[in-house]
Amino acid sequence: MYDTIKFVIKESELDNAICFLEEIPCRISIKSTSSNRVVGFLKNMKIEVRNTTLIVQGSLLKYFKGYNYAECLSVWDVRKSINKLSNELNVPMRQAVINRIDIGICFSMVNVPWVYWDCLLHSDGYFRSNIKQETLYFDKYDSQLCFYDKKTEMKKNREVENLECLKKINVLRYEFRFKKVTSIFGGVVRGADLYSPVFYLRVLQKWYDGYMIIQKGFVSEVDLLRFGGKKEFQRSCVALVMGQFNLYEVCLLYTSDAADERSS
């Protein structure tokens, strides 16, 4: 589910003194440098040092698995990937502030993805735009819903080997992008929160709600994969994800604890 994540951490927030301008450049492939700025990459992750601030941004799934179209990161995989990133940079990324979260899933469709855009009509508070045929956005100041043709994106990125696995199917990807993480979640979110099952549930719920509140239409020429209601939608994708992450048990435990608190 997690895709692009933006980590931001300052030297002053670390328990042990580290100079990013001295420590980071030897651990990455450098693209540009100046007296107080270094930009480079660690695999697919963009690494930027601005004086005493370290910014790391990229697909956590692609960093850990090498691709971001088929599998999801379990809660434990998220923890492993953040620990791996921490070890490679020698910086505790669990302490970093999270400034952006993208969460998404790919769907196998009957038709090419763009023919479904006319069925997704309106979402209150969001500006709908379809500038390019293969992509549909619902945008506002703190978040964005994005529906796009995953295979087209992979062709642009020249992911030829991965495309072989998908050549016989149409792949639609739906992402919910949290642009103002602190505002949406009502407080600072740190790297360690990403592998908290309770926080993962909150993110998943917003991804789910984002799709469900869109007003839907119907195009008779299209054999649309339609979700008849919440139960059908949950069976098709949310249940699969929650089952993989063991989130049903977490949800039941969380609900039980909340009920106990109310009764007491």
Language model features: what each stretch is:
Residues M1-L252:
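Structured, helix-rich domain cores that form ligand/interaction pockets
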Residues Y254-E261:
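Conserved small/polar residues in nucleotide/adenosyl-binding loops
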